[in-house]
């Protein structure tokens, strides 16, 4: 599995990546709005196989209730998905220890996504980097705009409103008081090889990615950043690639519910001058 990840990653160094996401709950792919109002979107193995055939650069699998329910990600399902794809595979959900990460990698994942576990124990990132290598460690950050003024945070102003980006954990259900931009920088310093950045405000809306959140995070770290949350049409991906220096864009609804292949979206990106692998 590791060789598969390395060879494909090398070919993508100068291109933008398009990454479908499988949010999984009770063995089914689901999609929500602002991390709530969950609806069924299909079978994870069937969707994974489809996306792999249709030109996805990578696949992300997130067990969205594992941390909240204090359990690990379902290894059998991860293994079933890994068997039907030939692209880099990131799996997250409920990773709170080295053993959790090892289980996921042994089940067929190439990279491990860590969110709540890293916030609760930042030293875990350094442990994971030391054992599995930085290229296997993805820190997932779920961020939401907080409109309270706080001089200790990285403040922004848009349309006359001041705010900062706050980190949420346990599937977006618990606030942390952490500044998302600073946490991304700290996570990268501790051992994260990549940041998966999701805007809770934009999640499921189809209103486009949060360009400000994305670019400020890219500016703060020296590792690749994946933008997530808000993609409703190919033009949203065009915008995030044209208006930020992000390395990859993740999407779910545009692929789950629309009769559009990943390559179809990538052809639109290419026609707009955005370098992609076809």
Predicted regions and their residues:
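Structural preference for beta-strand elements that scaffold enzyme active sites
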Residues: 17-21, 58, 86-90, 111-113, ...
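Charged helix-capping and loop-helix junction motifs
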Residues: 72-79, 122, 177-181, 207-216
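Glycine-rich, proline-tolerant flexible connector loops at the mouths of alpha/beta enzymes
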Residues: 58-76, 116, 196-208
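Glycine/small-residue-rich loop that forms an oxyanion/phosphate-binding "nest" at active or ligand-binding sites
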Residues: 74-132
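Conserved anion-binding
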Residues: 24-26, 30-31, 35, 109-197, ...
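Conserved, mostly hydrophobic/aromatic
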Residues: 23, 51, 59, 104, ...
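Catalytic cores of alpha/beta
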Residues: 89-90, 95-108, 212-249
């Amino acid at each position: 599995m590791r060789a598969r990840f390395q060879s494909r990653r090398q070919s993508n160094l100068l291109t933008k990546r398009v990454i479908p996401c499988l949010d999984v709950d009770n063995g089914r792919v689901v999609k929500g709005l602002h991390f709530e109002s969950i609806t069924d979107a299909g079978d994870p193995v069937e969707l994974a196989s489809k996306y792999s055939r249709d030109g996805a650069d990578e696949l992300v699998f997130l067990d969205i209730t594992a941390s909240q329910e204090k359990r690990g990600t379902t290894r059998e399902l991860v293994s079933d998905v890994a068997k039907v794809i030939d692209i880099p595979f990131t799996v997250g959900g409920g990773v709170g220890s080295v053993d959790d990460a090892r289980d996921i990698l042994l089940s067929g994942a190439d990279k491990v996504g860590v969110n709540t576990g890293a916030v609760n124990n930042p030293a875990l990132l350094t442990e994971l980097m030391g054992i599995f290598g930085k290229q296997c460690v993805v820190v997932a950050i779920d961020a939401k705009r907080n409109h309270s003024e706080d001089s200790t945070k990285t403040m922004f102003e848009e349309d006359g409103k001041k705010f900062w980006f706050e980190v949420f954990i346990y599937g977006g259900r618990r606030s942390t008081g952490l500044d998302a931009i600073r946490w991304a920088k700290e996570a990268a310093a501790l051992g994260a090889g990549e940041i998966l950045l999701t805007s809770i405000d934009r999640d499921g809306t189809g209103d486009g990615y949060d360009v400000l959140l994305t670019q400020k995070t890219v500016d703060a770290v020296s590792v690749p950043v994946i933008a997530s949350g808000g993609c409703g049409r190919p033009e949203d991906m065009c915008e995030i690639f044209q208006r930020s220096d992000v390395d990859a864009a993740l999407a779910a609804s545009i692929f789950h519910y629309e009769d559009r292949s990943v390559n179809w979206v990538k052809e639109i990106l290419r026609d707009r001058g955005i370098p992609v692998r076809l």
